[in-house]
């Protein structure tokens, strides 16, 4: 399956965000933090990052399906996209 660079970047960030979130739920942070305040900040930033990346990937046309790839080709054919 051929994907454009933007789709690849968004998909990778999406996966990183969700893996990080799942690890955070199980208290398996890559960098152990002992201070309570630092942990709360980390959790808040982690949730915010996950929400932002999820919204970004949801609303951006990623052309992942066959229909989406056909739409991208039609847009390119008619000069309506980069």
Swiss-Prot record:
Keywords: Cytolysis, Host cell inner membrane, Host cell lysis by virus, Host cell membrane, Host membrane, Membrane, Transmembrane, Transmembrane helix, Viral release from host cell
UniProt entry tagged with the keyword Membrane: yes
Disulfide bonds: none
Subcellular location: Host cell inner membrane
Principal cellular location given in the protein's record: host cell
A GO cellular component annotation in the UniProt record: membrane
GO terms of biological process kind: killing of cells of another organism
UniProt membrane topology term: Multi-pass membrane protein
InterPro entries the UniProt entry points to: Holin (IPR006479)
UniProt key word Transmembrane: yes
Topology feature Cytoplasmic, residues: 1-8, 58-82
Transmembrane segments: 9-25, 41-57
Periplasmic topology ranges: 26-40
Coiled coil, from the record: none
Pfam name, any one: Holin_SPP1
Protein name in the entry: Putative antiholin
Species annotation: Bacillus phage SPP1 (Bacteriophage SPP1)
